């Protein structure tokens, strides 16, 4: 992807030294789930990983990721006639999948920072889907990733540690290059 003139290159030295959230080793199981479809279906991949993580963490139930991908693709990627996926597409697809469960509902917000910090600071956090945008200089362009930890570097910049559905389970992205987010919360 062509670099935008205001895009900043971050190196390992720019990253936070301490992270808050979920242990990255819990996401290595998703390394082999790489989005190779053109155009990409990154929203489906991160939604499947979020549901898979939820079921494993809270119910110790191991569901087949391939099954989740097959079920979620039409509910997320094929919902509307427009190209690409928006936060509400992920929310609605997740809610369609979880409706019979009755315990969780998907929500979305147009700004990721307050939600990621709140959700990953909980005692038993769940990962949060975050959307990067090319307009803000993301090397991923417009893309959905699954954030499971956050941290601040020495300059006070907020970063997320993510599963990027390109084969990396410890990808670090600056929060300033994200926009919307989608998360699951328990129904009250």
Could you tell me what each predicted segment is?
Residues 4-6, 11, 69-188:
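Conserved active-site-adjacent core of cysteine acyl-enzyme catalytic domains
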Residues 1-83, 153-155:
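Active-site-adjacent structural segments surrounding the nucleophilic cysteine of cysteine proteases
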